[in-house]
Amino acid sequence: MVSLGLVVARFNDSVTEPMAEAAREAATDRDAVIVDEVSVPGAYDSPLAADRLARRDDVDAVAVVGAIVTGDTDHDHVIASATADKLTQVSLDRDTPVTFGVSGPGMSGAEARERIDKGADAAEAAIDLADELD
């Protein structure tokens, strides 16, 4: 049985909470267990939480969910790029799968709501990687 850590960004929680629920359901459907869930203010804050979870002996993989919507500037692109880079670094540094279930950048809130299934995708990818790399 795969043990997961789940990181959930609260910013845009009307999107991220359903994403987290989709991740929880996917884990249950795949007979995986979420041993810990960490809530962070936004996607940009997720690498530290993912790192803390990836350090744990009882966590086989970490799934991260969040939503980055567009604004009046390119801020969403900066946040998405930095977050993806740091989450990849956590995965490599800890030798633990960390999956990127963060929708965006460059999308509206409505488009983000259409991508709630990214939460399930992140959990399923984490489970698959943990199984494959075990």
From Swiss-Prot:
> Listed GO molecular functions?
6,7-dimethyl-8-ribityllumazine synthase activity
- Its GO CC terms? riboflavin synthase complex
Output the SUPFAM superfamilies linked to this UniProt entry: Lumazine synthase (SSF52121)
Q: Looking at the Swiss-Prot or TrEMBL record, what is one Pfam family this protein matches?
A: DMRL_synthase
Q: Which residues bind (2S)-2-hydroxy-3-oxobutyl phosphate?
A: D72, T73, R115
Concerning InterPro entries, the annotation shows: LS, LS/RS, LS/RS_sf
Could you say which enzyme class this protein belongs to? transferase
Q: What residue stretch is flagged as signal peptide?
A: none
Stored PANTHER family: 6,7-DIMETHYL-8-RIBITYLLUMAZINE SYNTHASE (PTHR21058:SF0), 6,7-DIMETHYL-8-RIBITYLLUMAZINE SYNTHASE DMRL SYNTHASE LUMAZINE SYNTHASE (PTHR21058)
Query: What function does the entry list?
Result: Catalyzes the formation of 6,7-dimethyl-8-ribityllumazine by condensation of 5-amino-6-(D-ribitylamino)uracil with 3,4-dihydroxy-2-butanone 4-phosphate. This is the penultimate step in the biosynthesis of riboflavin.
Protein name stated in the entry: 6,7-dimethyl-8-ribityllumazine synthase
* Gene source species: Halorubrum lacusprofundi (strain ATCC 49239 / DSM 5036 / JCM 8891 / ACAM 34)
Q: Please state the gene responsible for encoding this protein.
A: ribH
